[in-house]
Amino acid sequence: KYKLGDLFTKIKTNSLHYKTSDLPSVSDNIYCLPALTAGIQNQGLNNFVPYENATVLQNVISISANGANTGATFYQSQKFTVLQDAYAIKWIYTNNKLTDKQYLFLTGSISKAIYGTYEWTNKAGWERIKNNAIFLPQTENGKIDFEYIELLISAIQKIVIKNVVLYTDKQIAKTQKVINNNF
């Protein structure tokens, strides 16, 4: 059992003075940096801002801190910035380096610990959630078992891919049956 504040730190970002309603939802030559808000569609990245004055983040975890989606948690593997009603946290150990699979596991663990616990009047701000605990697998000597995390996420990915292939094969078989019966 680990407190979030013992594993992560909130990232300070420059304040950007844009209204989401004035920002494009499609990237162009100037407005090309995805901007994080409290939404859950597209991992909260629904608008674009210029790079100028923005704090560019990548390979961090974002957390929605407002509205109906407060506590929604995503691993952000691509460049983005924080616009409003959300924030980003970074891992403070192992030289701040984790693999994508490790980030996915930690994001799921954080989501399980906080999503649905907070609400409009009790927002999931960092000062509140940093005391929440997450459960992580440990090695025999009490360290976080990153090898197990890698293995588990790889196994889950393989199962998902297998199920998608099986589903697709069934759909193809149904389609072929309809075609064969009608032509």
State the predicted function of each range.
Residues 5-133:
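DNA target-recognition domains and sequence-specific DNA-contacting regions of bacterial/archaeal
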Residues 1-42, 139-183:
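Non-catalytic DNA-recognition/assembly elements of restriction-modification systems
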Residues 135-137:
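A short, hydrophobic, proline-anchored segment that marks a local hinge/packing element in signaling
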